[in-house]
Amino acid sequence: MWLAAAVPSLARRLLLLGPPPPPLLLLLSRSSRRRRRLHSLGLAAMPEKRPFERLPAEVSPINYSLCLKPDLLDFTFEGKLEAAAQVRQATNQIVMNCADIDIITASYAPEGDEEIHATGFNYQNEDEKVTLSFPSTLQTGTGTLKIDFVGELNDKMKGFYRSRYTTPAGEVRYAAVTQFEATDARRAFPCWDEPAIKATFDISLVVPKDRVALSNMNVIDRKPYPDDENLVEVKFARTPVMSTYLVAFVVGEYDFVETRSKDGVCVRVYTPVGKAEQGKFALEVAAKTLPFYKDYFNVPYPLPKIDLIAIADFAAGAMENWGLVTYRETALLIDPKNSCSSSRQWVALVVGHELAHQWFGNLVTMEWWTHLWLNEGFASWIEYLCVDHCFPEYDIWTQFVSADYTRAQELDALDNSHPIEVSVGHPSEVDEIFDAISYSKGASVIRMLHDYIGDKDFKKGMNMYLTKFQQKNAATEDLWESLESASGKPIAAVMNTWTKQMGFPLIYVEAEQVEDDRVLKLSQKKFCASGPYGGEDCPQWMVPITISTSEDPNQAKLKILMDKPEMSVVLKNVKPDQWVKLNLGTVGFYRTQYSSAMLESLLPGIRDLSLPPVDRLGLQNDLFSLARAGIISTVEVLKVMEAFVNEPNYTVWSDLSCNLGILSTLLSHTDFYEEIQEFVKDVFSPIGERLGWDPKPGEGHLDALLRGLVLGKLGKAGHKATLEEARRRFKEHVEGKQILSADLRSPVYLTVLKHGDGATLDIMLKLHKQADMQEEKNRIERVLGATLSPELIQKVLTFALSEEVRPQDTVSVIGGVAGGSKHGRKAAWKFIKDNWEELHNRYQGGFLISRLIKLSVEGFAVDKMAGEVKAFFESHPAPSAERTIQQCCENILLNAAWLKRDADSIHQYLLQRKTSPPSV
C-alpha cells in the first residue's frame, strides 16, 4: 500500500510545468526547427488536389429499376438498368459514374416518344465516369434510360464483389456481396453516384435457387427464372428515396435468427450456416437499439425490416446500408463460450453505430463528402449513448475518452491533420477522410456540444433537423441552425471554430487565492505535437469550459464559454486547501496545462481516487501529450504514472498502458529498452497481484477487461510469475486438459509467443488452422508479431499473405509484426516494399492500404526513415493514402526529436530507480 506520507510531495519532485513554461523564444525556436525539418522533406503540405468535377445537372434519376444476375462460379455478373430520369436541360449526352463495367447497349426513350439509341460510350477511367452520346438532342422532360452491362465480381472488397467462405462440410464457396461507400456503387451498375443525387430503387436479383438473396427492402416476389431451372428471380419492394452508396445486395448461404422490436420492426441477424446461435447477442442489441433511437429522435424507423449480416471478406468493420447492414464476422458474431468480453462490447458499439446511421446518414444524408463527419462523427458519439443505455455496467463513456477523444487529439495535433469539414473531390480524396478526425474528433466535438446545450434541447434540435431534412440532404450549417433554434445558444459561432479549422487549443491556467475566492487566469494557444505554436496568427476557439473543485468533484462549480485568447474567472467560496480542475469529465476538446502549484494540489486526488476516473485519465493523458510535444519532461510524467498504483479503473489502466506502449516503442530504438520494461512491471505488478488469474465472485465486465489488459502487459514485459503461469495454462489449453477462458487467451497467447520459440509459433499456427470462429483466428493473428526471432518474424510475414489469412486481416498481422519489436518494424517495412505490388493490388486504394502504411512505419524514430518512406511512395504512389503518408513521416520526425530530447534523462531516471526505488 502506498501512503501519501511515505515520500516527499510528488509534485515538488516534478518541477513540471512552471513557474510558467520554459522561455517562449526557446520553445518557439525548437518548434520552428522541427517545422523546418518537415519542410526540408517536403512534408509540410499535402500535394495539390487532383482535378475533379461533380456530375453535370442536366439529367438526374427519379427511380432505378435494376436487375443483376451474378455468376458465383465465373465471378461475373450481368445487369439490366431501366432508370426513370429527368432531363432538366436539353442535351445530346448523359454523364454518369461507371467503373470496371462494360456497357453493351444504352438507349433513352422520352416519355411517349421513340427510343433513341446511344451511339457512343466514352469512358473517363481516371474520373470513373462514362459519357453516353446520342444522335439527337434529349429534350427536357422525363423518360427512361436503359442500359445493359456486364461486370466482374472482383476480389477487392469493394463494389459488387466475391467473398470466400467454407461450408460446414469443408467446401470452399463464394458469396456475392456489396460495399459501395464511398464511391463504389458505380462498380456494380452505371449510376449518378453522388450522395445528393437521390432516387428510389426497384431491385431484382437472379440467383441460384438454393441461395439466400437479400437487399435493402423486403422480398415481394420470388419466381422461377425462365431461362434456367436452377435459378430464381427475387424481387424486392421499392426503397424510399436514397443515395446510391446505401444500396446493397447479398447472395449466399446463411442461417438467421429473428425477432421484432417493441415498435414492430422485423429484425434478423444472418450468420454463416450452422452458426445462428452466434447471432443472438447482436439480435438482442439491435432489438433494444431501434426503439432507443426512435424515442431519442422522436422519428420512427422508416423501413419494415432491418437485416444484419456477417460477411466473410469485408474491408470495413461494418456498413450501414439502409435496411441491410453488413458486418465483418468479428463485429457481429458472439459465441457464448468462446467470445471474450471485449468482443461483446465491440459488437454492441458497432451495432449501435450502424443503426444510428439508419436515421443520421440514411434518412438525412450529407450533401457532399465534405460533410462526412455529420454521418460518422454523430454515429460515433451516439453509439456510446446507446450502449450506455443498454449496458450501463460497461462504464462506456470513460472508455470513449481513451478510445476516441485522445486518439483524435493525437492525430489533430499534427501539422498534416485536416479540419473536420474538409473539401474533397476525387474518389481517392474521399477515401482519405475516413479517419480519426471525421469519426473520433467529430464524435468528441458533438459530445462537447451536447454537454454545452444540455440533453433536452439537444434532442429537440435533433428532431427538428431529422424532420426537416428527412429523405433529403443537409450540410453542417443545417444541423447548427436546428440546434441553435432549439437551444437559443450561438451554436454556429461556437462550432465553426471546431469544424472549419484544424487542431484544438491548449488551455494554460494559473490560480491565485484572493480571500475566500479562487481567481483563475486562462489563456489559449493552438496545441501542436511539435511544441508550442509559433505562428503569428494563432487560431482561436470558442471553448466551453467546465470547472470543478474538490468540494464536489463530480459537479461543475462554474461553466463558461471562453471566447477570447485570455480571460480571468472568479470561483466564489473556494478554500485554500481545495483543488480546482478544468474540463470536468474530460468533455471539452482541449488539453490543459496547469501551473506547478495547481498540479501539485491535484496529484493527491490520483492517489486517493477522489478525482473521478475520467478526470484521472484526462490529467495523465494531457501530461503525456505535453511531454511528447517537448513542453515538459517525460521523466516527470513517469513520476506521475507511479502515483496510479492504487488505481482500480479499467479505462484509466488502458490509457496508461497505451502511453507506456508508445514510450516502449520509442525506447526500442535505444539500448535500455529492458529498463522501461522493468518500469512497466513495477507499475503493473500491484494491480496484477490484486486481480490474480481467475475471476472472483461479484466481478463483472470491466474486471474481465482489466485482468486481460494487466496480464498481457506483464507477460509482454517478461514478468517472471506471469510468464510461468501463462506457459502452464497454455500447455493445458493445447493438451485439452483445461481450455483457456476467452478473456485470457489474448494475454496468454501474447506472452508465450513473445518469450517462445519456433515450436511455440508452430503450435499457434496450428490453433489458428483449427479455429472454427473468426474471432479466435483474429485473436491469434494479432499476437503473431510478438515473436522476436528474425527467422520466425519472416515466417509470420509470409503467413500474412497466405490463404490462411483473410485479405482484410493481413493488415493486422503485418502491423502486429511492425509493432512487436525494432527488428519486426524493419522486417515489416522491407516486406511491404518487396510485396508492394501485390498489397496495393489487393486493397486497390481503399482505406486498408492507409492503415497498413500507418501501422507499419510510424513507429520509426530516425530522421532518415521519414525521407526513405517519402521517397518510396513518390515512386510507388498510393493516392488514397497520401495524407496518411504525410502524417507518418511527420510522426517519425517527431519521434526522432523526442528521443534526442529525452532519451538520456529517461535512462538516468530508470537507472536511479534501480538503486533507490520509490516507496510505493
Swiss-Prot record:
Tissue: Widely expressed. Highest expression in brain, particularly the striatum and hippocampus. Expressed in Sertoli cells.
GO annotation, cellular component aspect: cytosol; nucleus
Cofactor descriptive note: Binds 1 zinc ion per subunit.
Active-site residues, record numbering mapped to chain: E354
Single annotated GO MF: alanyl aminopeptidase activity
Motif Nuclear localization signal mapped to chain: 727-731
UniProt binding sites for Zn(2+): H353, H357, E376
Residues the record lists as binding substrate: E181, G317, A318, M319, E320, N321
Catalytic reactions of this protein: Release of an N-terminal amino acid, preferentially alanine, from a wide range of peptides, amides and arylamides
Keywords per UniProt: Aminopeptidase, Cytoplasm, Hydrolase, Metal-binding, Metalloprotease, Nitration, Nucleus, Protease, Zinc
EC number(s) given by UniProt: 3.4.11.14
Cofactor: Zn(2+)
Compartments reported by the entry: Cytoplasm, Cytosol; Nucleus
Site (Transition state stabilizer) location in chain: Y439
One of the Pfam families matching this protein, by short name: ERAP1_C
Regulation of protein activity: Strongly inhibited by bestatin, leuhistin, actinonin, amastatin, 1,10-phenanthroline, DFP, PCMBS, Zn(2+), Cd(2+), Co(2+), Cu(2+), Hg(2+), EDTA and puromycin. Not inhibited by PMSF, and only slightly inhibited by leupeptin and aprotinin. Activity is increased by Mg(2+) and Ca(2+).
The protein's enzyme class: hydrolase
Quaternary structure note: Monomer.
Function summary: Aminopeptidase with broad substrate specificity for several peptides. Involved in proteolytic events essential for cell growth and viability. May act as regulator of neuropeptide activity. Plays a role in the antigen-processing pathway for MHC class I molecules. Involved in the N-terminal trimming of cytotoxic T-cell epitope precursors. Digests the poly-Q peptides found in many cellular proteins.
Protein family according to the UniProt entry: Belongs to the peptidase M1 family.
Name of protein: Puromycin-sensitive aminopeptidase
Organism (species): Mus musculus (Mouse)
